[in-house]
Regions:
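Catalytic activation segment of kinase domains across protein kinase-like and atypical kinase folds
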Residues: 199-247
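ATP-binding pocket architecture of kinase catalytic cores
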Residues: 4-167, 174-188, 207-210
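Catalytic-loop of the protein kinase fold
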Residues: 188-190, 195
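All-alpha amphipathic helical-bundle segments outside canonical DNA-binding/catalytic cores
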Residues: 281-299
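Short regulatory "switch" loops immediately downstream of catalytic or recognition motifs
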Residues: 9-16, 33-36, 147-151, 198-205, ...
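C-terminal interaction modules of eukaryotic adaptor/scaffold proteins
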Residues: 320-324
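Protein kinase glycine-rich loop
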Residues: 1
């Protein structure tokens, strides 16, 4: 499953006894082909230069750093346990669960818990480069690779040539200018909080306030808060389980309304209140309005980022999906 990696559930046969506290089931994650810009990928410093078809992660340093991140998140009950790593992937805790569906994101209780989980995630202090270079650094790298791409198939080439008629460099310049004028705190971001990266844990009551778990931290980095929330709101629109080509469906009317956004923001801020201190009603209302502007401006960056990512994936990915 997923659009970047291959996932396999592995289990011991019933007649094989487990040794010590070893798990009987694990999740095997095999990294897919994904473009890795040097020094900005996943927020991990020190990555070596990567070619257009490299597999992540690159080098021992980045493997160690990503494993550290995964282990810290597991220790804080924000992610699955890590059982082992190897250059092409890792072994993770298998958690009985199901991934959320797109329509689940609109459920007020689920949206509330996602907001709380994201706020906790943003409150973490991680041992990584805290400068917010990931967003524009990665997009610049994608643009460079896109300028060198060639597609042998006529249908892909036609779509690619149409995309090139847009001045992507100018679009990014305008986007950068807009976001530089938009205050947004730098926090440790997941950067891909879509329904497929949120588990609904089996055996938890529907009314439980701790029934969800974020997974898939490959894009996590220090980044602007507005991007993480704005990107999540964009994901309300997309269903990636569509059975027919291009294997996704976009319903723009599902983008969260003002009230749905405020519902999310208020629960996000309620979890963050311990770090911010008490606020008056007027201050709370001002913060909410500022966040609405911040989030919806950074949602534009989400569209642009994943648009560039998708062009590159159309060239290098072996997963059957309508990237272009």
């Amino acid at each position: 499953g997923g659009l970047s990696n291959l996932l396999f559930k592995c289990a011991l046969p019933e007649h094989i006894l487990s040794v010590g506290d070893e798990p009987r089931q694990v999740l095997l994650r095999v990294y897919g082909a994904i473009l890795q810009p040097p020094h900005v990928s996943a927020g991990l410093p020190g990555r070596g230069a990567a070619g257009a078809h490299c597999l992540r992660p690159q080098g021992v340093d980045s493997l160690v750093l990503e494993s550290v991140m995964f282990a810290i998140l597991a220790e804080r009950a924000l992610g699955p346990r890590l059982y082992g790593v190897f250059p092409q992937g890792r072994l993770e805790q298998y958690i009985p669960s199901r991934r959320l569906r797109t329509e689940d994101l609109r459920d007020p209780d689920i949206s509330k818990e996602i907001a709380v989980k994201m706020s906790r995630f943003h409150g973490m202090v991680m041992p990584f480069n805290k400068e917010p270079k990931w967003l524009f650094g990665t997009m610049e790298w994608y643009l460079k690779q896109i300028s060198e791409l060639a597609f042998p198939e006529e249908e892909q080439l036609k779509k690619f040539n149409h995309l090139k008629t847009y001045n992507l460099q100018e679009e990014m310049k305008s986007l950068r200018e807009l976001l530089e004028s938009t205050p947004s705190p730098v926090v440790f971001c997941h950067n891909d909080v879509q329904e497929g990266n949120i588990l609904l844990l089996a055996g938890h009551e529907a009314s439980s306030s701790d029934k969800l778990m974020l997974i898939d931290f490959e894009y996590s980095s220090y980044n602007y808060r507005g991007f993480d929330i704005g990107n999540h709101f964009c994901e309300w629109v997309y269903n990636y389980t569509y059975d027919f080509w291009p294997f996704f469906k976009a319903s723009q009317e599902n983008y969260p309304s003002r009230q749905q956004q405020l519902h999310f923001i208020r629960h996000y801020l309620s979890e963050d209140s311990g770090r911010r201190g008490d606020t008056t009603h007027e201050e709370q209302a001002r913060i909410e309005e500022e966040m609405l502007t911040e989030i919806n401006r950074f949602a534009l960056a989400s569209h642009f980022f994943w648009g560039l990512w998708s062009i590159v994936q159309a060239k290098i990915s072996t997963i059957k999906f309508g990237y272009l």
